[in-house]
Curated annotation (Swiss-Prot):
Gene3D superfamilies, per the entry: 3.30.300.20, Ribosomal protein S3, C-terminal domain (3.30.1140.32)
Sequence similarity: Belongs to the universal ribosomal protein uS3 family.
Quaternary organization: Part of the 30S ribosomal subunit. Forms a tight complex with proteins S10 and S14.
Record-level GO cellular component terms: cytosolic small ribosomal subunit
InterPro entries recorded: KH_dom (IPR004087), KH_dom-like_a/b (IPR015946), KH_dom_type_2 (IPR004044), KH_sf_prok-type (IPR009019), Ribosomal_S3_C_sf (IPR036419), Ribosomal_uS3_bac-typ (IPR005704), Ribosomal_uS3_C (IPR001351), Ribosomal_uS3_CS (IPR018280)
Keyword 4Fe-4S: no
Keywords carried by this UniProt record: Ribonucleoprotein, Ribosomal protein, RNA-binding, rRNA-binding
NCBIfam families the UniProt entry points to: rpsC_bact (TIGR01009)
Domain KH type-2: 39-107
Gene it is expressed from: rpsC
Protein name per UniProt: Small ribosomal subunit protein uS3
MF term (GO), any: rRNA binding
GO BP term (any one): translation
The protein's role, per its UniProt record: Binds the lower part of the 30S subunit head. Binds mRNA in the 70S ribosome, positioning it for translation.
Length: 214
C-alpha cells in the first residue's frame, strides 16, 4: 500500500503536517478550499518566488496567514521588507480579507523534494541531458545528508518519439515505514517536445518521535 498512496498524506500527523490549517462549515468549506488554491497559484507565478518548497495557510477570525517556505528568503522579503508589503496588498485585494505574510527558510534545500524536483525540471527546460540532471541532483542530496533518493521522469524524454518513464535510485526509500521521514514532490518541465513529469522521493531518516517511542 505504501507504494500506491502519496507519501505525504500517508504520514500526516506522524511525520508531516497539514499545509492548510482552518475549520469551516459545509457552506464555507468549498469556497475556502478554492481560495487556498487561488492563493498558491497566484504566488507561484511570481518571478521573485524562486526555490519555494511549500505555501502554508492558516485562517483565524476573518484573517489569513500565509507562510512561504523557501530556500531564498531574501528574494521574497525584498529590501527592507518591500516585497512582503506588496504581497500583502495583492493578496488582500485578491481575497477581500486581511492577509499576513511570513517567510520561513529551508535550511537544507538539497534535501527538499519540491526544490529538487523544480531544479531538475528547469535543467530539462534548458536542454541539459536528463541523466546528468538526475544524477547531479541525487548526488547533491546524498552529500547533504539524505539516506536515499529516487527520481522519476515521464514523457518524451530527450525528444524521443514515444513517451517513456526513466528512474534512478540511490540509497533506501522505505515507503512502507511510517516512521520514515520521506519527502515527496512533483514538478513539470515544459520542453519543446511537450511536458515531462518529475517525481522525487527523499528519505531523510526516522522522525524523533518514533525513536523516543521505540
Amino acid at each position: 500500500m505504501g507504494q500506491k498512496v502519496n507519501p505525504i498524506s500517508f504520514r500526516l500527523v506522524r511525520t508531516r503536517d497539514w499545509r492548510s490549517k482552518w475549520f469551516a462549515n459545509k457552506k464555507e468549506f468549498g469556497d475556502l478550499l478554492v481560495e487556498d488554491q487561488i492563493i498558491r497559484a497566484y504566488l507561484l507565478k511570481k518571478p521573485a518566488l524562486v526555490g519555494v518548497s511549500a505555501i502554508k495557510i492558516k485562517r483565524m477570525s476573518g484573517k489569513v496567514e500565509v507562510t512561504i517556505v523557501t530556500a531564498r528568503p531574501g528574494l521574497v522579503i525584498g529590501k527592507k521588507g518591500a516585497e512582503i508589503d506588496v504581497l500583502k496588498g495583492e493578496l488582500s485585494k485578491l481575497t477581500g480579507k486581511e492577509v499576513w505574510v511570513a517567510v520561513e527558510e529551508v535550511k537544507r534545500p538539497d534535501m527538499d523534494a519540491k526544490i529538487v524536483a523544480d531544479s531538475i525540471a528547469k535543467q530539462l527546460e534548458r536542454r541539459i541531458p536528463f541523466r546528468r540532471a538526475m544524477k547531479k541532483a541525487m548526488q547533491s542530496s546524498i552529500d547533504a545528508g539524505a539516506f536515499g533518493i529516487k527520481v522519476q521522469l515521464s514523457g518524451r524524454i530527450g525528444g524521443a518519439e514515444i513517451a517513456r518513464t526513466e528512474w534512478y535510485k540511490e540509497g533506501s526509500t522505505p515507503l512502507h515505514t511510517l516512521r520514515a521521514d520521506i519527502d515527496y514532490a512533483t514538478g513539470r518541465a515544459e520542453t519543446t517536445y511537450g511536458s515531462i513529469g518529475v517525481k522525487v522521493w527523499i528519505y531523510r531518516g526516522e522522525d524523533n518521535l518514533a525513536k523516543k517511542e521505540a
